[in-house]
């Protein structure tokens, strides 16, 4: 076959695939997905061990899902590696032509960006198919849907930080008038990402200066899953927690003396979204479940087990808090653009500098 014939054949195949995708995109309805989902029954899901409240929360989600759609769905859950590793795994599976290991993928902007760039996500007209899903919820249009909103912020123990000395922003942490209260006692996260994203508000030089001052007064490093050490009083304050408001609500419900405050305005925010990877074993059930997680009954389960919710679902804890406190969140598009630009030499150098500062 000549090169021209090969080209024409390839173009014809690509055209046929695009037509097929367009028809599939247009053909989905709630009714057709429910009918197809009833034949699939099992939703395979790999994520962090405590995702959606662990087994108890997932059981509640199964019950609410089946009640809404008249299905007999079961979540076949397995704990897996971190979100970056799971994204890389799905991309490799898709490129090899295999079925992916999880029907759905949960990740924030950075993790979903990895999948988006590799064209690893199913195209689904969520807002067009499901009446309760809005276009605003599609963080990556026709690919991902917001499941819960996680504003970043400072957390501290109110029994150990006097009210008149309490920080109201990240800059207060290194203010010479306030910092003696926690100098040599403050915990900071070991991650570069929260500082790198802070540059969207501050610029790189201001972030590096802040990081140096913060490290100079720090007492140690805490991961985002270790906020209990603030509750216990081992550290009186933590410079940043990736899900600060949800953590505060969770611990306050247990009687813990924890307060969360935003570090910047607008607040640096992680938008955790669900998507359906290409080659999913149970694609109809997966699409239905992604949309279901934005319903009030699904959000109630998240709030019950994790104190998490979407600010875009009316009546949720996050929705009410942000509206009543008049707090503004960083635009998803702003942080998405940051990740979709990829790792420039300048960006990699900046992160390398931050990593070096954190190790001091």
List each model region and its residues.
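Bacterial N-terminal signal peptides that target proteins for export
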Residues: 1-11, 18-19
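Sec/Tat signal peptide C-region and signal peptidase I cleavage site
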Residues: 18-26
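Extracytoplasmic "Venus flytrap"
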Residues: 25-30, 40-60, 272
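Signal peptide-proximal N-terminal region
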Residues: 36, 64-75
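Extracytoplasmic ligand-binding site segments that recognize negatively charged/polar headgroups
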Residues: 46-63, 76-91, 98-235
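Extracytoplasmic/periplasmic substrate-binding proteins
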Residues: 202-207, 217-279, 314-326
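Mature extracytoplasmic/periplasmic domains
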Residues: 267-268, 272-337
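Conserved C-terminal helix/tail region of periplasmic/extracytoplasmic solute-binding proteins
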Residues: 331-360
